[in-house]
Amino acid sequence: MATIDSMNKDTTRLSDGPDWTFDLLDVYLAEIDRVAKLYRLDTYPHQIEVITSEQMMDAYSSVGMPINYPHWSFGKKFIETERLYKHGQQGLAYEIVINSNPCIAYLMEENTITMQALVMAHACYGHNSFFKNNYLFRSWTDASSIVDYLIFARKYITECEERYGVDEVERLLDSCHALMNYGVDRYKRPQKISLQEEKARQKSREEYLQSQVNMLWRTLPKREEEKTVAEARRYPSEPQENLLYFMEKNAPLLESWQREILRIVRKVSQYFYPQKQTQVMNEGWATFWHYTILNHLYDEGKVTERFMLEFLHSHTNVVFQPPYNSPWYSGINPYALGFAMFQDIKRICQSPTEEDKYWFPDIAGSDWLETLHFAMRDFKDESFISQFLSPKVMRDFRFFTVLDDDRHNYLEISAIHNEEGYREIRNRLSSQYNLSNLEPNIQIWNVDLRGDRSLTLRYIPHNRAPLDRGRKEVLKHVHRLWGFDVMLEQQNEDGSIELLERCPPRMGNL
């Protein structure tokens, strides 16, 4: 079992402020770094930037990125955040951390030294180590090139605005953003290339793509037999879930610069793909380590009681889970659930009960530090909950499941936190973090190559859930990119196909 001695008291205590200086930040950072190394936290080098509340709101509005291309939606988000913040209806995060190499962490200058220490432990060592080591981030993102790529994207889109007009570029980005969640291949992992390679390939990609589009949309087949075979074959041969990629490669009317912008939005969507699937784990891991590191410093006598009281007050607020019948309830707090599960894994390893040995025979009594790193590296929220959610955590959170069947006019409590309900609760909760259950399953089904060039999308409902009424507006964006008629079908449980929408609509069809 891993044992790390944190009880050697040090009579030299760090200043507890509350005001901070850059020198004091350096001292705290050095101590946090020393403790983090004891727990084998493997991180990227970090770059810490202290910013104002207005700069933090600006970072909020640009989805936390240090630089981004221009679009009205970012300004709208800034104004909304600023209004809520100034009226006291919304607070600001103490930090924002960027999955990059070096890992960029933004600290609010209004923070006390206690909060700055918490943020450095949370972001620079918790999130940072998660970004570097979790399998989804390793497979789907390239931390060393994201900032350079965003600089390239900003420059390219700005040049397009100057050449083709702001309105034209804005309309294209509107459509790309509307389909951003459908810009990732979930099973085909992206190839990692440097910014220099990206630029070198850009010109050749433009020429190649246009030649491929010309080949796809040629109207005069060489031989009659070729025509017959082509008409009998559906295109694409398999349904395609990556709508933006398909548009980039196949939309008949897009120009090369428009295809490049689609590619840029796809790349940004791909960057955020792991984050959507690891919020509980990522925040839980970072919260576990800021709690562990700062308690370690207190046990060593490095920080004061006043420091700890302020820290624990903030930490308790972060991991508070309102009950289901509270007016402040808005779902399960990912900080609370993630922190509780990592704490529980440590407990199961160090002091397993008979219940723990039955539920977790592989990890009960094992090295807690090794087990925690294994859980962090090789799981995402769905599988993490399915594998490690224990009966104790279910009891602590008082979990129960509510079955809402659209075929009945009542709700059913199908499981509670007891022996009969543990497995169902765990399965139901993990399925809530399955991205396939959270986003509509809409795929490109067919293109009428030899007819009117119409595009057919097919929606396969999950648990008979209907599409939102906003589907009409989204279909307009698909039509803008494709350039020809677009149809949206639904495949029902009995296998029948139903036409939901057509853009542009035809009189008498809908």
Swiss-Prot record:
It comes from the Bacteria. To B.subtilis SpoVR. The lineage of its organism: Bacteria, Pseudomonadati, Pseudomonadota, Gammaproteobacteria, Enterobacterales. GO terms for biological process: DNA damage response. Pfam families: SpoVR, SpoVR_C. This is Uncharacterized protein YcgB.
